[in-house]
UniProtKB/Swiss-Prot annotation:
The keyword Aminoacyl-tRNA synthetase applies. It comes from Flavobacterium johnsoniae (strain ATCC 17061 / DSM 2064 / JCM 8514 / BCRC 14874 / CCUG 350202 / NBRC 14942 / NCIMB 11054 / UW101). The gene is tyrS. The lineage of its organism: Bacteria, Pseudomonadati, Bacteroidota, Flavobacteriia, Flavobacteriales. ATP binds at residue 237. GO terms for biological process: tyrosyl-tRNA aminoacylation. GO terms for molecular function: ATP binding; RNA binding; tyrosine-tRNA ligase activity. It catalyses: tRNA(Tyr) + L-tyrosine + ATP = L-tyrosyl-tRNA(Tyr) + AMP + diphosphate + H(+). This is Tyrosine--tRNA ligase.
Length: 431
């Protein structure tokens, strides 16, 4: 079999693994799982590393298992958290589980008939009938409190300045550990993967498999590094918060812009992690980018590849069209194709003013619009000089002083875009 660990290492997707993991993956088709807890009804780009890891696993001939944590989500993972998580109610959890299943289904074909077809499971299905007494006897008996207390996620909470850790969160690693044993027993799953912050929980699982599975039981672990930006700040957030994988939470335009705006150092790192381009292609792109960094070749290729992967080629083309509007490489037709949400996002931060729709019934002369109605220009004289200089556009089309603004000029029946020169924009919202 091809060497998956070697592939992960050059891409920057490998952090650590248990002894024997690489040999197991080279020896035979191996089932491996990653857990996704339903803390929200979608996933953001912070989860992309784990999704991509499952896709690489599949591409290298192994079987990926995506576990949605309907049970573990009821408790909350304490790893990397300084405070107790708020418990989610069942209705919210059910909605979140459905949302995450929907997202994962875009990247892995769970209906495939292949031998190594991806599987999706929900740990609530096997935990819901487990009584506390049975769990304490069958699982709790196998792992000592000393072992659990030695985990970093536990030590940091207990030795920190907060309120410590509840018994509920303390048991999280046992439930996650039992997930591994359940998948080992029922799906012949030998490997659990996750972010490096999950090492403690994952190794509890490998320990449980060995102690519950008998003397021939084997279990392996592999983790990915936590992704940070070159400046050390947290990856996955923009100024507006999380960058989501659902277009109704983060538009395709904003998703595309997030990657296009990456620094050179970040783009060089991200293109290895977040795309499936081969090493030769990536090395050539990096070399080409370094000859003309101002063209942002690397960032554009990164944004294109991951936008197609997460959304589609069609959505990528729309995002590129929307991006071109701000930089002058667009037409009036391109502007009219924008939906309301994308229009407002493209021109976020641009000065705006409202005009009553009734004012447009008989038409408004452009000088009145530019000065009195919007304040885009300070005086009629200044507006006329700009018009005479042929520097005013309405919806990307140059106009003269005799232009009259009417309802026929509205974009989405609501907006008008004014432009003076190359970079001065003004949006009229008609109400």
């Amino acid at each position: 079999m091809k060497n998956l660990v070697e592939e992960l290492k050059w891409r920057g997707l490998y952090h650590d693994s248990m002894p024997g993991t690489e040999e197991q993956l080279l020896k035979e088709v191996t089932s491996a799982y990653i857990g996704f807890d339903p803390t929200a009804d979608s996933l953001h780009i912070g989860s992309m590393v784990q999704i991509i890891l499952l896709v690489h696993l599949k591409n290298f001939g192994h079987q990926p298992i995506a576990l949605v944590g309907g049970a573990t989500g009821m408790i909350g993972d304490p790893s990397g958290k300084s405070d107790e998580r708020n418990l989610l109610n069942e209705e919210t959890l059910a909605k979140n589980v459905a949302g995450i299943k929907s997202v994962l289904s875009r990247f892995l074909d769970f209906n495939s008939k292949e031998q190594n077809a991806p599987i999706m499971v929900n740990n609530y299905d096997w935990m819901k009938e487990f009584s506390f007494i049975d769990f304490a006897r069958e699982v709790g008996k196998r792992i000592t409190v000393n072992y659990m207390m030695a985990k970093d996620s536990v030590k940091k909470r207990i030795n920190g300045e907060g309120e410590g850790m509840s018994f509920t969160e303390f048991t999280y690693q046992l439930i996650q550990g039992y997930d591994f044993y359940h998948l080992y027993k029922n799906n012949n799953c030998l490997l659990q993967m996750g972010g490096s912050d999950q090492w403690g929980n994952i190794t509890t699982g490998t320990e449980l498999v060995r102690r519950m599975g008998g003397e021939n039981a084997k279990a392996f672990a592999l983790t990915t590094p936590l992704i940070t930006k070159a400046d050390g700040s947290k990856f996955g957030k923009s100024e507006g918060g999380n960058v989501w994988l659902d277009a109704d939470k983060t538009s395709v335009y904003k998703f595309y812009q997030f990657w296009v705006n990456a620094t050179d150092a970040d783009a060089e790192k991200y293109i290895k992690i977040f795309t499936f381009l081969d090493k030769e292609t990536i090395d050539a792109l990096i070399a080409e980018h370094q000859t003309a960094p101002h063209l942002r070749i690397l960032q554009k290729k990164l944004a294109e590849e991951i936008t197609i992967f997460v959304h589609s080629k069609e959505e990528l083309e729309k995002a590129i069209q929307a991006s071109n509007i701000l930089f002058g490489n667009s037409t009036a037709d391109d502007l009219k194709k924008l939906d309301e949400k994308t229009f407002l996002e493209v021109f976020d931060g641009v000065p705006q003013a409202e005009i009553a729709k009734a004012d447009l019934e008989n038409g408004l002369d452009i000088v009145t619009v530019l000065n009195e109605k919007t304040g885009f220009f300070k005086s009629n004289g200044e507006a006329r000089r700009a018009l005479t200089a042929n520097s005013i556009s309405v919806n990307r089309e140059k106009i003269k002083e005799d232009f009259v603004l009417t309802a026929n000029d509205l974009i989405n029946n609501q907006f008008v875009l004014l432009q003076s020169g190359k970079k001065n924009y003004f949006v009229i919202r008609v109400v």
